[in-house]
C-alpha cells in the first residue's frame, strides 16, 4: 500500500496543475505550443508508472 501511494505522485499532480495555470496566463501562441509538448511528456510518464503497478 505504501508503494502505491508513492507511485500516485501527489507532488506530480500539483505540479501539472500549476503548469496548466501558467500556460493560460502567458497564453501568447508560443507559450501554448511549448505547453502542449510538456503535456505529452507528462502523459507518457503516467503510462509508464501504471504499467509498473500492474
From Swiss-Prot:
Tissue expression profile of the protein: Gonads.
Taxonomic superkingdom: Eukaryota
Entry keywords, A to Z: Chromosome, Developmental protein, Differentiation, DNA condensation, DNA-binding, Nucleosome core, Nucleus, Spermatogenesis
Primary location: nucleus
MF-aspect GO terms: DNA binding
Compartments in which it is found: Nucleus; Chromosome
Cellular component aspect of the GO annotation: nucleosome; nucleus
Residue numbers spanned by region Disordered: 1-54
Biological processes, Gene Ontology terms: cell differentiation; chromosome condensation; spermatogenesis
Job description of the protein: Protamines substitute for histones in the chromatin of sperm during the haploid phase of spermatogenesis. They compact sperm DNA into a highly condensed, stable and inactive complex.
Name under which the protein is recorded: Sperm protamine P3
